[in-house]
């Protein structure tokens, strides 16, 4: 069940959903707006000749920080990692999705490539996969609305929520834009002809 504004407020009050900082004015009819932090990661295009999700390529991205009152420019065709300002906590009975803001989408800004789902039990800053598919550079300001989270009540609490042993939860408690850790539990099935 998708939570309405009143359900979001009740879940926050009961401790099932936590966003820090909590700003009630960010609550929308069926979502809550989240804001952009000032930390970003860009690809270091000279460190590797290719990306391999099975390998630890620690120098693949470099983190940088912009001043709280300074914009960062995302150029056409550029991809960068960012993060929400809000630290998010979900209890085992709530899952969430991160969606873009339509006003930013109309400017060519994509908030996430594929990783919009947030598991029950997750806590941390949400890493954003930012892309500019427009033909002009776009200023991104720390603290601006960058996306919206909608919440789903599970039919029963997850038996093994994100962060519990054996779930491969390698982003639990993340701070800032966190690079891929796909190599930590890379899986590849053997395919026969």
UniProtKB/Swiss-Prot annotation:
Keywords: Hydrolase, Nucleotide metabolism, Nucleotide-binding. It comes from the Bacteria. Pathway: Pyrimidine metabolism; dUMP biosynthesis; dUMP from dCTP: step 1/1. The keyword Hydrolase applies. InterPro entries: dCTP_deaminase, dUTPase-like_sf, dUTPase_trimeric. Residues 167-183 have a biased composition (Polar residues). CDD domains: trimeric_dUTPase. The record marks 116-117 as: Important for bifunctional activity. SUPFAM superfamilies: dUTPase-like. GO terms for biological process: dUMP biosynthetic process; dUTP biosynthetic process; nucleobase-containing small molecule interconversion. GO terms for molecular function: dCTP deaminase (dUMP-forming) activity; dCTP deaminase activity; nucleotide binding. Residues 162-184 are annotated as: Disordered. The active site is at residue 129. It catalyses: dCTP + 2 H2O = dUMP + NH4(+) + diphosphate. It holds the Pfam family DCD. It is an enzyme of class 3 (hydrolase). DCTP binds at residues 101-106, 119, 127-129, 148, 162, 174. Its EC number is 3.5.4.30. Homotrimer. Belongs to the dCTP deaminase family. Bifunctional enzyme that catalyzes both the deamination of dCTP to dUTP and the hydrolysis of dUTP to dUMP without releasing the toxic dUTP intermediate. This is dCTP deaminase, dUMP-forming.
